[in-house]
Amino acid sequence: SDASEPAPACVVMYESWRYTTAANNCADTVSVSVAYQDGATGPCATLPPGAVTTVGEGYLGEHGHPDHLALCPSS
């Protein structure tokens, strides 16, 4: 299947009305994208350990609420 696997639990997603943010609490660098409840996925973002970054629109955006963070395929 084309469905990407969920990001590990040590990558935490925070949502607000404006942004969806990911925090990497893992020991390794991870590349994640937001999977929205409507089936859309956002662009991939690479987070080194300890990084916190905006990974997509918040719940007032085009795709509504994020569902989870998904791992991006390794290039």
From Swiss-Prot:
One of its GO terms (molecular function) is alpha-amylase inhibitor activity. InterPro entries: A-amylase_inhib, A-amylase_inhib_sf. Disulfide bonds join C10-C26, C44-C72. It holds the Pfam family A_amylase_inhib. It comes from the Bacteria. Keywords: Alpha-amylase inhibitor, Disulfide bond. Inhibits mammalian alpha-amylases specifically but has no action on plant and microbial alpha-amylases. This is Alpha-amylase inhibitor Paim-2. The lineage of its organism: Bacteria, Bacillati, Actinomycetota, Actinomycetes, Kitasatosporales.
